[in-house]
Amino acid sequence: MCSIWLTFFLSFLILNTKAEQVYQTCADESFEPNDYWKQKMLCMAYRFNFYGYKSNSMYAFMDCTFIRVGWMDKGTRKWNVAKMAADMHASGFPDRTAELTEIEAMCNMEFRNKLGPMSYYRCIETSKQGPGEFKQMLRNREVEFFSKNQCQGVDLD
């Protein structure tokens, strides 16, 4: 009975945080309303295509998203594994704390002083279960964002 209430409570929390629409909010904070780069960032986020676009704008955008949802501490840039695991669980996935802790350790060894959302995302991408579940969690969290084609009229080449 307790686990049913916990599941309900966690689902309620993630539904409440969905309303913020983090991708759109971070893009709005980082760019002017009609800035082409803003739409380009949103398109890349929509496609989960963050490679090859290593600009200060992309890093700032990704920092904003990870900090705003609580997956990274702004000051230390440390990954908040517990928060991400809780968000994944609230999104319907099994507890992935152990897997995310392993990914964090691997990431710390590989990237050392260059840790941030781009490196964390890259580490998640190279894990066994990480990419599919992480992307689905984001789709569940950012329903409004992913329900619209963010790449219409955008050329990524």
Curated annotation (Swiss-Prot):
Bridged cysteine pairs (disulfide): none
InterPro entries the record matches: PBP_GOBP_sf
Keyword Secreted assigned: yes
Principal place of residence: secreted
GO cellular component, one term: extracellular region
Domain of life: Eukaryota
Signal peptide residue numbers: 1-19
Annotated localization: Secreted
Keywords: Secreted, Signal
Gene Ontology MF term list: odorant binding
Conditions for induction: Up-regulated following blood feeding.
Changes seen on gene knockout: RNAi-mediated knockdown results in reduced neutrophil infiltration of the host skin at the bite site.
Tissue specificity annotation: Female salivary gland (at protein level).
Family: Belongs to the PBP/GOBP family.
Note: Mice with dietary resveratrol supplementation, which attenuates activation of MyD88-dependent NF-kappa-B signaling induced by the protein, are less susceptible to Zika virus infection after mosquito bite.
Subunit structure, as described in the record: Interacts with mouse TLR1; the interaction promotes activation of canonical NF-kappa-B signaling in host macrophages. Interacts with human TLR1. Interacts with mouse TLR4; the interaction promotes activation of canonical NF-kappa-B signaling in host macrophages. Interacts with human TLR4.
Function description: Activates MyD88-dependent canonical NF-kappa-B signaling in host macrophages via interaction with host TLR1 and TLR4; this drives the expression of neutrophil chemoattractants, followed by the subsequent influx of neutrophils and recruitment of myeloid cells at the bite site. (Microbial infection) Promotes Zika virus infection in mouse model by facilitating recruitment of flavivirus-permissive myeloid cells at the bite site.
Stated name of the protein: Neutrophil recruitment protein
